[in-house]
C-alpha cells in the first residue's frame, strides 16, 4: 500500500503542504485509489474524522460545507470565513498529534451566491499568507457552478483558478448537476445529472490540464446527495471513462495541447476526478468510478447518520436521567450550562452520570470514527480500491 513517497515531507506537520497535497493527488490518480473527504460540522466530528483516519492509517481530506463553515463561527456570529478559519486552526493544532497520517483541509460546495462572502475572501487571505512565506490555511476550495450555465461556470472557474495559483491551493469544480439537496442547494433527479464527453473537452480547453493551475473536476454521472432507496439512484460510472478517454485521445491526436503532461501522471486519465453523492452506492459502482480516475470521494450523509444515531442512542437509553437531572426535580440552571459549555461538561459532575455530556459526547467520536473507518477498511480487505496511505 505504498507509493514511494515518504512521510515527513511536510516537516512533521499532519496538515499537508501544497507540495504534499499535489503528491497525494498524483499518487491516487496513478495508483487507482481515492481519498475520503469527510464533511465535519464541529470539533467533535472533526476529532472523530481524525481518529478514523489514524486508526485506518489512511491519509485523507476533511472539509466544511457552506453551512458547516457558518456553524463553526457560532450562531450569533454566523460568518463563513470566521468559521472556516476557526475550523482550520483547530484542525492544524489537533491534527499535529497524528503524525502517522497526512490530512488536507477543503471547503465544499461554494455556490455562486456565497463566493464573495466565503471562498474569494479565503483565497485572498491565503494569497497574503503565501506572500509572507507562509503555507496557506486550506489546501483546496470547491466552486460549485452546477446551477449556472456551463460558460458562466467556466468563466468563474478560470478566475478562481488564477486566484488559486496565487494562494498555492487546488480548485475543485463541478460540471453538471448532482441531484438531491446539499445545504439548501438542490437539483432534480433527471438526465441533467449526467455530464458528457463534449463537456470534458470544453473544460480542458478553458482551464487547461494543469498548466494554468491544478484543479479537480466533479463530472456528474447520476450522483445524488442524501440517502435513497435502491434503484432510485442510477449511476453510470462508465461516463467518467468516456470523458477521460475522449480528452486523452484528443491529446494524442494533437487536437488538444497538454503542456503539463497530464497523461504522464496517469495514462488515459487527464483529469483528477471527484465523486459526489456517493451514499448508498453499490461497492462495485464506487470501485468502477475510482478506477476511472476519481481521487477524492465525498462522505457526508453516512457520517451524519452515524453521529445522530449516537446522540439518539444515548438520549433514549438514559431518557429519565436526562430529563430528571437532580432526582425528581429538574435543574434549569444545570440544563442551561450543559447546553452552553458543551465540551467543558466535566465542570458539572462526574462522567458516569447519564446526563453528563462527558458520557454523552464520548460515544460520538467512537461511533463516527468507526463509520469513517469502515469505508477505509474496505481497501485493505480488497473490496474497494478506495483509500490508501502514502508512506
Predicted regions and their residues:
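Generic N-terminal amphipathic, Lys/Arg-enriched alpha-helix
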Residues: 2-14, 19-35
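Glycine-rich oxoanion-binding loops at beta->alpha junctions
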Residues: 85, 105, 369
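Active-site environment of divalent metal-dependent phosphoester hydrolases
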Residues: 223-225, 280-282, 305
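C-terminal alpha-helical cap/extension of soluble enzyme domains
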Residues: 4-9, 290-391
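Internal helical hairpin/lid segments
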Residues: 269, 275-298
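Glycine-rich beta-to-alpha transition loops that act as phosphate-gripper elements at the mouths
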Residues: 40, 106-111, 271-281
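Short, conserved beta-strand segments within well-ordered enzyme catalytic domains
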Residues: 37-39, 59-63, 104-106
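Alpha/beta enzyme core
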Residues: 19-27, 43-78, 82-100, 112-269, ...
Amino acid at each position: 500500500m505504498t507509493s514511494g513517497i515518504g512521510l515527513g515531507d511536510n516537516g512533521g506537520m499532519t496538515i499537508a503542504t501544497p507540495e504534499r497535497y499535489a503528491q497525494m493527488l498524483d499518487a491516487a490518480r496513478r495508483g487507482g485509489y481515492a481519498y475520503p473527504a469527510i464533511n465535519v460540522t464541529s470539533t467533535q466530528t472533526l476529532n472523530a474524522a481524525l481518529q478514523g483516519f489514524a486508526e485506518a492509517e489512511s491519509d485523507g481530506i476533511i472539509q466544511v460545507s457552506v453551512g458547516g463553515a457558518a456553524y463553526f463561527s457560532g450562531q450569533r456570529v454566523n460568518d463563513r470565513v470566521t468559521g472556516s478559519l476557526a475550523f482550520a486552526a483547530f484542525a492544524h493544532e489537533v491534527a499535529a498529534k497524528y503524525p502517522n497520517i497526512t490530512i488536507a483541509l477543503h471547503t465544499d460546495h461554494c455556490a455562486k451566491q456565497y463566493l464573495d462572502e466565503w471562498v474569494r475572501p479565503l483565497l485572498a487571505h491565503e494569497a497574503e499568507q503565501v506572500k509572507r512565506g507562509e503555507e496557506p490555511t486550506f489546501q483546496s476550495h470547491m466552486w460549485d457552478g452546477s446551477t449556472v450555465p456551463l460558460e458562466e461556470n467556466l468563466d468563474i472557474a478560470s478566475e478562481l483558478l488564477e486566484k488559486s495559483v496565487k494562494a498555492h491551493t487546488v480548485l475543485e469544480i463541478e460540471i453538471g448537476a448532482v441531484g438531491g439537496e446539499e445545504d439548501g442547494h438542490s437539483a432534480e433527479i433527471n438526465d441533467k445529472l449526467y455530464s458528457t464527453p463534449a463537456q470534458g473537452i470544453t473544460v480542458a480547453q478553458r482551464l487547461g490540464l494543469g498548466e494554468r493551475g491544478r484543479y479537480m473536476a466533479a463530472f456528474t454521472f447520476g450522483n445524488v446527495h442524501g440517502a435513497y432507496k435502491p434503484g432510485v439512484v442510477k449511476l453510470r460510472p462508465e461516463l467518467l471513462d468516456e470523458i477521460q478517454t475522449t480528452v486523452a485521445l484528443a491529446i494524442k491526436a494533437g487536437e488538444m495541447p497538454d503542456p503539463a503532461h497530464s497523461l504522464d501522471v496517469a495514462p488515459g486519465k487527464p483529469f483528477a476526478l471527484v465523486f459526489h453523492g456517493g451514499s448508498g452506492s453499490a461497492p462495485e459502482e464506487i470501485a468502477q468510478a475510482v478506477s476511472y480516475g476519481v481521487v477524492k470521494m465525498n462522505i457526508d450523509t453516512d457520517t451524519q447518520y452515524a453521529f445522530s444515531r449516537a446522540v439518539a442512542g444515548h438520549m433514549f437509553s438514559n431518557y429519565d436521567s436526562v430529563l430528571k437531572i437532580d432526582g425528581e426535580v429538574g435543574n434549569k440552571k444545570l440544563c442551561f450550562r450543559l447546553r452552553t459549555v458543551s465540551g467543558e461538561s466535566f465542570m458539572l459532575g462526574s462522567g458516569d452520570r447519564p446526563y453528563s455530556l462527558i458520557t454523552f459526547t464520548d460515544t460520538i467520536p467512537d461511533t463516527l470514527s468507526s463509520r469513517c473507518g469502515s469505508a477505509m477498511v474496505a481497501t485493505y480487505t480488497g473490496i474497494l480500491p478506495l483509500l490508501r496511505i502514502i508512506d
